[in-house]
């Protein structure tokens, strides 16, 4: 069983005729993802690597039913593209756009929640259910990083994702579904909102979260564990442990407020809730072995 996407997911790629959209749509197809059509306004009738292009999601979905949307759309057009997918009835959306205006990110999240949809991103490298389907810009072909197994991964960091996931594989494990929630201040979906999906998935035996300085997503995970809303073994790695106090760095979401958001505070919360925290990526595999045997 996979989370968010699987081998039967039918994907529309919005922004498919752009350089990034065309490049990564091909890689999504090459992995086995069912990319059923693409969208670029004004370019209906074109073809991108065998993917038919339509003017809008509504027009394309009449000929090619789809249940997932992948957006390769600039930040200033992302809100409209998300709303277009929602209006067409799509409930699972992923957007890689980095720098979506804050007020529009809030509107996107509210709109998705109001209609029972889930938007992952922006500022994410994407989602992969290993061996089944991929959304975004994930280098699925690196076997030492993306091997199928029983560990779910949630990440805020694109650069740390490959490093930590490689350590999971080196430790003798593999990945069910990896979801990059993104590093912006207002992500469409937060770690704690994804935990119930991993909790319900029989193929996921443990979860690794790749967090970082700032925000409160990791503390929210600890709260879910304390409340027994998530009961599976959990290992966390947090980037920014040695960051100088008061220095601006990293993603827009790397903001410490009201004493919350520090790596020290996140670590204490996760440990108190029963999770394990790796001080460096190389410790992740050993911690999983200790928990899973």
From Swiss-Prot:
Triggers of expression: Induced in sulfoacetate-grown cells but not in thiosulfate-grown cells.
One Pfam family from the record: CoA_binding
Cell membrane found in the keyword field: no
pH dependence: Optimum pH is 7.5.
Protein name in UniProt: ADP-forming sulfoacetate-CoA ligase subunit SauD
Function, as annotated: Involved in the degradation of sulfoacetate. Catalyzes the CoA- and ATP-dependent conversion of sulfoacetate to sulfoacetyl-CoA and ADP. Cannot use other sulfonic and carboxylic acids, and shows only residual activity with 3-sulfopropanoate and malonic acid.
Gene3D superfamilies reported in the protein's UniProt record: NAD(P)-binding Rossmann-like Domain, Succinyl-CoA synthetase domains
Organism expressing this protein natively: Bilophila wadsworthia (strain 3_1_6)
GO cellular component: succinate-CoA ligase complex (ADP-forming)
């Amino acid at each position: 069983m996979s989370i968010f996407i699987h081998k039967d997911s039918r994907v529309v790629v919005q922004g498919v005729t752009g350089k990034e959209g065309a490049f990564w749509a091909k890689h999504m197809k090459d992995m086995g993802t069912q990319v059923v059509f693409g969208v670029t306004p004004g370019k209906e009738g074109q073809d991108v690597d065998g993917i038919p292009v339509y003017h809008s999601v509504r027009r394309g979905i009449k000929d090619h039913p789809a249940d997932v949307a992948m957006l390769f759309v600039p930040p200033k057009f992302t809100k409209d593209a998300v709303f277009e997918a929602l209006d067409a009835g799509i409930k699972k959306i992923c957007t890689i756009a980095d720098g979506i205006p804050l007020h529009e990110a809030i509107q996107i999240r509210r709109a998705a929640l109001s209609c029972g949809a889930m938007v992952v991103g922006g500022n994410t490298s994407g989602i992969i259910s290993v061996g089944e389907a991929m959304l975004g810009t994930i280098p699925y072909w690196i076997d030492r990083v993306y091997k199928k197994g029983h560990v779910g991964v949630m990440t805020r960091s694109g650069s740390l994702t490959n490093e930590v996931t490689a350590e999971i594989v080196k430790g003798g494990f593999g990945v069910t579904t990896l979801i990059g929630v993104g590093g912006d201040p207002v992500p469409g979906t937060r770690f704690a909102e994804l935990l119930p999906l991993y909790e319900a998935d029989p193929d996921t035996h443990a979860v690794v979260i790749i967090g970082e300085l700032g925000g409160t997503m990791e503390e929210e995970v600890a709260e879910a564990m304390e409340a027994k809303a998530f009961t599976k073994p959990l290992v966390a790695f947090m980037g920014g442990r040695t960051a100088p106090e008061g220095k601006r760095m990293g993603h827009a979401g790397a903001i410490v407020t009201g004493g919350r958001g520090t790596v020290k505070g996140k670590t204490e919360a996760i440990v108190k809730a029963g999770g394990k925290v790796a001080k460096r990526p190389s410790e992740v595999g050993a911690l999983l072995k200790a928990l899973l045997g």
